[in-house]
């Protein structure tokens, strides 16, 4: 359990800064979660599937017992875990796009889906063939679009 506490503490220090919970607070929270049967192993904490049940159980505990310490700690830990997970995804995508994936192929994200030609031209700042008047003529008066100025 000590290794998990160190990893979580490090992530919290990185992503929570001065509000980071102490190792003692993290350890107490993990012990409570194991005692309550929400974690079979401390490493289960890394699984996003366990996050909602943990949040619900700690919220219920706060309402029944009025104890908010573990919920506050969990909120900080959860924020750090989500940030670390997002950063890892971003890092993996960057490696894939740069061809540094080491043979591991990841599916492209939604931003890699081919855009229609008109959207590509808009992204590049070119004019689109359809004018505002033509677009407005297709819409009902209450749906008239106001062109955005960039």
From Swiss-Prot:
One GO CC term on file: virion component
Give the start-end ranges of region Disordered: 107-150
Q: What Gene3D superfamilies does UniProt report for this protein, alphabetically? A: Immunodeficiency lentiviruses, gag gene matrix protein p17
Q: Where are the transmembrane segments?
A: none
Identify the SUPFAM superfamilies for this entry. Answer: Retroviral matrix proteins
Quote the subcellular location field of this record: Virion
* Record keywords: Virion
Q: Which Pfam families match?
A: Retro_M (PF02813)
Q: In what ranges is there compositional bias, type Basic and acidic residues?
A: 112-141
* Cited InterPro entries: Gag_M (IPR004028), Matrix_HIV/RSV_N (IPR012344), Retrovr_matrix (IPR010999)
Q: Anything noted about its domains?
A: Late-budding domains (L domains) are short sequence motifs essential for viral particle budding. They recruit proteins of the host ESCRT machinery (Endosomal Sorting Complex Required for Transport) or ESCRT-associated proteins. Gag contains one L domain: a PPXY motif which potentially interacts with the WW domain 3 of NEDD4 E3 ubiquitin ligase (Potential).
Q: What else is known?
A: This protein is a product of the Gag-Ros or p19-Ros polyprotein.
Question: What name has this protein been given in UniProt?
Answer: Core protein p19
**Chain's gene name:** gag
């Amino acid at each position: 359990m000590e290794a998990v506490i160190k990893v979580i503490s490090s992530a919290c220090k990185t992503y929570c800064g001065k509000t980071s919970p102490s190792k003692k607070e993290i350890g107490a929270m993990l012990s409570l979660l194991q005692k309550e049967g929400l974690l079979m192993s401390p490493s289960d904490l890394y699984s996003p599937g366990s996050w909602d049940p943990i949040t619900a159980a700690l919220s219920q505990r706060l309402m029944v017992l009025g104890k908010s310490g573990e919920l506050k700690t969990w909120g900080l830990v959860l924020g750090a875990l989500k940030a670390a997970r997002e950063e890892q995804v971003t890092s993996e995508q960057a490696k894939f796009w740069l061809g540094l994936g080491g043979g591991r192929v990841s599916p492209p994200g939604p931003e890699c889906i081919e855009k229609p030609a008109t959207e590509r031209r808009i992204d590049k700042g070119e004019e689109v063939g359809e004018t505002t008047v033509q677009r407005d003529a297709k819409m009902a008066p209450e749906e008239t679009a106001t062109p955005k100025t960039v």
